[in-house]
């Protein structure tokens, strides 16, 4: 029996065995992998989303009730159970992806669907050592990666056959995924964007009511995520509040290109009661960023803001940007904000002090954002545009390959040209299903690049969600007849 003619049953069995060997094998080799941010989820830190912290809490509570409080691989044994559970979840979702592709395109492409997901996982584990992306890592990505695959399958299915049950699954899993990892708001944006294009502009699917249904569900998803987050914090901390520190990354990004004149934006806060002397806080933060050379003027090759060029500067610029961003946030903004709250609001307990510090960050974010938007298309906004477009380019590059060695940048460019050429050929040759799937995958990839590039900085752990799907749909376009 050739692989080409393999039955659905045998295909499912073989791929399930292969996936089990790979992912369970990794758990047995590594045990639970502890990363830099792991402890904050275990501690149910106020800066973290509710979903993953609750999963860890439930496992911990269950094992304590059963009297299983020993260690495995040098960590509490319940973390090994979490790692195994996560790995089984990966197995099930990737197997589901393989079976979905088998259903429409046969065993070869179904096998490639499984292969590309294993390949991405293997690259993360054995070549790139991206610890947070392993199935056995005690990190939100360990659930977000397979959930992103599952949501993509549901979005494919929504346009394969429009069903209420698919919409319900999309809604529920979207809420779950964002509750676990806020970064997955990018999928909600993808869903809304795809629905907008398909239901309003593509003749076969044109149905404005269906777009409105998706839009209502999208808004409802945001409301549910917020309600879950606030209810969780009320149960844990006694206050109805979303997790804090959500604006710091965006402030880091804006501070990287700010000029001395930005201090004047905060002069109105000199006599503010809600944010007393916020102008002094911002001036301190800005001056410290400059003093430590964490701003755009200090990347290698900088001559002047006017001479900045995306074409010539983006590689060195984004490298410097990525190196300094966390330092801007965690060594300047966050401690400065905490010191500010301690000085002007000493009566607040720890929880309310964190809420106040978050409000301070939101206020700074709002002021800087409005100013950046106002000047974005002007001469003064040139540096902002260069950083944004440079980050977006990097996002696209590392979603398909990497920036090092630099030959991979050119290779990724060729791959995108090939992808679009195949996409157009699929449209011209009536391969509608393949073209639709390629469009949805690329939409998710593009939204992730733009949002991540605008809010923080692209790095492989943020960008590889679509990688396996990107190469899968490219192969579907090339191989399917």
Predicted regions and their residues:
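Extracytoplasmic catalytic/substrate-binding loops of multi-pass membrane glycan-assembly enzymes
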Residues: 27-73, 77, 242-243, 353-358
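Juxtamembrane membrane-water interface segments immediately following transmembrane helices
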Residues: 34-36, 40-42, 218, 222-342
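Membrane-interface anchor segments at the N-terminal boundary of transmembrane helices
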Residues: 77-89, 346-446
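Transmembrane-helix motifs of polytopic, lipid-linked glycan transferases
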Residues: 84-107, 150, 154, 422
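Transmembrane-helix signature of polytopic, membrane-embedded enzymes
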Residues: 95-127, 145-146, 162-169, 439-440
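Multi-pass, polyprenyl lipid-linked donor-dependent membrane glycosyltransferases
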Residues: 123-155, 177-190, 462-467
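Membrane-interface transmembrane helices that cradle and orient dolichyl/undecaprenyl
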Residues: 149-166, 481
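Membrane-interface alpha helices of multi-pass inner-membrane proteins
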Residues: 167-181, 218-229
């Amino acid at each position: 029996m050739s692989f080409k003619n393999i039955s659905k049953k045998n295909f499912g069995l073989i791929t399930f065995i292969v996936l089990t060997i790979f992912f369970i094998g990794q758990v047995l080799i590594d045990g639970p992998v502890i990363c830099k941010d792991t402890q904050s989820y275990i501690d149910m830190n106020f800066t973290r989303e509710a979903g993953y912290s609750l999963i860890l809490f439930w496992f911990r509570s269950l094992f304590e009730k059963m009297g299983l409080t020993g260690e495995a691989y040098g960590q509490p044994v319940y973390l090994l159970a979490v790692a195994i559970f996560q790995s089984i979840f990966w197995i099930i979702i990737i197997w589901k992806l393989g079976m979905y592709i088998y259903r429409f395109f046969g065993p070869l492409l179904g096998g490639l669907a499984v292969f590309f997901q294993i390949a991405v996982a293997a690259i993360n584990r054995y070549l790139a050592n991206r610890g947070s992306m392993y199935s056995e890592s005690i990190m939100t990505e360990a659930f977000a990666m397979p959930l992103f695959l599952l949501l993509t399958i549901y979005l494919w299915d929504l346009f394969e056959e429009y069903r209420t049950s698919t919409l319900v699954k999309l809604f529920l899993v979207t809420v779950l995924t964002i509750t676990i990892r806020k970064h997955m708001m990018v999928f909600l944006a993808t869903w809304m964007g795809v629905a907008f294009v398909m239901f309003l502009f593509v003749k076969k699917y044109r149905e404005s009511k269906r777009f409105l249904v998706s839009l209502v569900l999208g808004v409802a998803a945001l409301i549910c995520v917020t309600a879950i987050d606030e209810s969780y914090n009320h149960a844990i901390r006694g206050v109805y509040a979303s997790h804090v520190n959500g604006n710091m990354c965006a402030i880091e990004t804006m501070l990287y290109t700010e000029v001395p004149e930005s201090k004047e934006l905060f002069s109105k806060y000199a006599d503010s009661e809600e944010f007393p002397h916020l102008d002094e806080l911002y001036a301190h933060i800005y001056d410290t960023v400059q003093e430590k050379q964490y701003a755009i003027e200090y990347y290698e090759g900088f001559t002047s803001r006017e001479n900045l060029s995306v074409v010539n500067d983006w590689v060195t610029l984004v490298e410097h940007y990525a190196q300094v961003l966390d330092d801007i946030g965690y060594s300047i903004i966050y401690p400065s904000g905490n010191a500010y709250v301690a000085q002007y609001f000493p009566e607040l307990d720890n929880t309310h002090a964190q809420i106040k510090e978050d409000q301070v960050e939101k206020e700074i974010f709002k002021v800087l954002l409005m100013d950046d938007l106002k000047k974005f298309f002007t001469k003064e906004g040139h540096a902002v545009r260069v950083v944004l477009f440079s980050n977006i380019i990097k996002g696209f590059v590392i979603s398909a390959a990497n920036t090092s060695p630099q030959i991979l940048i050119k290779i990724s460019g060729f791959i995108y040209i090939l992808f679009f050429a195949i996409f157009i050929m699929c449209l011209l040759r009536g391969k509608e299903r393949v073209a639709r799937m390629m469009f949805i995958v690329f939409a998710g990839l593009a939204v992730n690049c733009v949002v991540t590039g605008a809010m923080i900085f692209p790095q492989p752990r943020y960008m590889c969600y679509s990688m396996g799907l990107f190469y899968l749909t490219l192969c579907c376009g090339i191989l399917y007849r």
